[in-house]
Amino acid sequence: MNFFNIEKTSESKARAGVLSTDHGTIQTPIFMPVGTVASVKTVHQREIKDDIKAQIILGNTYHLYLRPGMEVMQEAGGLHKFMNWDLPILTDSGGFQVFSLSGSRKMSEEGVKFKSHIDGSYHLFTPEKSMEIQRQIGADIFMAFDECVAYPSDYNQVKLSMEMTHRWLKRCIDWNAENPELYGHKQRFFPIVQGSTYSDLRKISAEVISEAGAEGNAIGGLSVGEPEEELYRITDEVTDILPKDKPRYLMGVGTPWNILESIGLGIDMMDCVMPTRNARNAMLFTWQGVMNMKNEKWKKDFSPLDEFGTSFVDHEYSKAYVRHLFVSKEYLAKQIASIHNLAFYLDLVKVAREHILAGDFYQWKDSVVPVLRQRL
């Protein structure tokens, strides 16, 4: 059984495919909800699977390492059993989170020494340590340990960082070759293209990552503050180089329109905290545009939350009621909004896939993106 099969390519770069893991198949393009600490914020696993219809979720290596810790994780039998989730999981390497701790970490060729945000204790993440933790977590897809630089960054700084990421990749690959899976299911390894917004560095990195021969490849270091045009330009350049027969994962992206544009550039997998984070701040994404549920205009609007929505919350609750919950600072507001946004994101990529299969993806995308961006 191949890990990745392409069902159809479009007239340009968009494609529909299937990822096959030991915990189930994933239809691509796919959006992956983020479950940082073994939970998607405010949402039950049953809702993620049955109502939101997620096919794969993310876990975070840095956060899970610190709490609950790997002793608990291994005694539970891995993350799937710990959180009672029987579908695929992807874990990041912890690199992005560690490098975000700019005031409390020290980097060397060996790895990164950092201070826990929980109790102030010091820890060392090396490529080998990141791989070991991700073995203990047991995700179906796990990522190489990389350095993600801030935007903007000096060219020479980005070049040195990228070269370090490439050296660390070799150490990740060597460790994986010597240390088999722990829980009886296959784990697939993805290295990460870096290089910020410098085209020549991205080209070098994409070629190095392609030559690694991994089962999938990721593009990191984007959606970190660069203009949308740069996000699309770099994504386009990198997908021109990455192997066409391997899945491509664009990390940390993004808005609904970012997602559709990225699919059009040949991306198969995406994740982002935006649907849940924005939901907790009363921002809902819909097929008609973006809604701020605290706005006065919804105060007496008793129509369904979203008549085109796919989740139960869209039809059981009115706009007026959800606005009332937000204004009243009720926890239920965040839960309803999170379920809605995640269900919308999953519906978005599902419909995008249907249009790729139908052969009219680009015409459809160009017509729907301006609508998605408008404020209601």
Segments from the language model and where they lie:
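C-terminal extensions of enzymes
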Residues: M1-V18, I26-P33, K41-T42, D146-P152, ...
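Short, electropositive alpha-helical surface patch
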Residues: N156-H166, S199-A212, A333, I339
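Glycine-rich phosphate/ribose-binding loops and adjacent secondary-structure elements
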Residues: W175, N179, R188-L305
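Non-catalytic, usually N-terminal nucleic-acid engagement modules in DNA/RNA processing proteins
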Residues: M1-L182, E296-K299
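Flexible, glycine/charged-enriched surface loops at secondary-structure junctions
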Residues: E178-H185, A358-Q363
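Post-transcriptional modification and biogenesis factors for structured RNAs
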Residues: H185, E296, V313
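Short, well-ordered coil/turn segments that N-cap beta-strands
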Residues: K53-Q55, W85-I89, G138-I141, G184-F189, ...
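Conserved, mostly hydrophobic/aromatic
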Residues: G24, I57, D92, Q134, ...
